[in-house]
Amino acid sequence: MSLNALRNLLGLLTVSLLVGCAAPKTVDYSAYKQARPKSILVLPPLNESPDVKATYSMLSQVTFPLAEAGYYVMPIAVVDETFRHNGLTTPADIHGLPPAKLNEIFGADAGLYITVKEYGTSYMLISSQTVVTASASLVDLKTGTTLWTGSARASSEEGNNSNNGGLVGMLITAAVKQIINTSTDAGHPIAGITSQRLLSAGQRTGLLYGPRSPKYGTD
């Protein structure tokens, strides 16, 4: 190998190492720490999936991780009834309301805007999996400032690499799973996992601990 070729190879290896050692994603928490919201209003999630159950399935799952993180969460049923009483029945219309108006109506410090991007079971040639993917933004309802954004995904096939039974067995298993999953809304428990990953505090890019948590202010 010539000297020039060796230099080129070393250069490529150096670039590869630099790419592989790229800095992990970071989040700017300065506005979040300045606002320090105590209460959160969860808006009905926007649904970009074809499954109509996605909005309320996800909505019913988010209170727990938020409460565990140390926030007061406005009661979901009361919020839903208030929107309906005022003629607001679709997530798109609700998401379009000015943040200051939401603060005026509910008195919450921040609003959580969620979008469900994937929800439900998909059938492929030799597998069938249930996936829920969602993104979220936490917005200061007094100023309209975005305090935090995040996303998460969960799948029923995580860690499942078994292929016992051959091709025919895999096809039958996938078909049976598809029937069971679509008839029982298998997306609901997966949405719970997604919401935990999305909204649990203490993660590197997750929500900060709220004032009701003993870990408040440690992050």
Language-model-derived ranges and their functions:
Residues 1-10:
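Bacterial N-terminal signal peptides that target proteins for export
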Residues 15, 34, 105-108:
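Alpha-helix termination/capping residues and helix-transition junctions
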Residues 17-20:
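C-terminal motif of bacterial Sec signal peptides marking the signal peptidase cleavage site
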Residues 22-38, 141-219:
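C-terminal/domain-edge helix-coil "capping" segments
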Residues 30-53:
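Post-signal peptide N-terminal segment of mature Sec-exported envelope proteins
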Residues 47-50, 79-83, 117-122, 153-157:
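Solvent-exposed loop/turn segments at secondary-structure junctions
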Residues 49-113, 145, 149, 178-179, ...:
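N-terminal segment of the mature soluble domain
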Residues 91-147, 157-162, 166-169, 212-219:
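Surface-exposed short loop/turn segments
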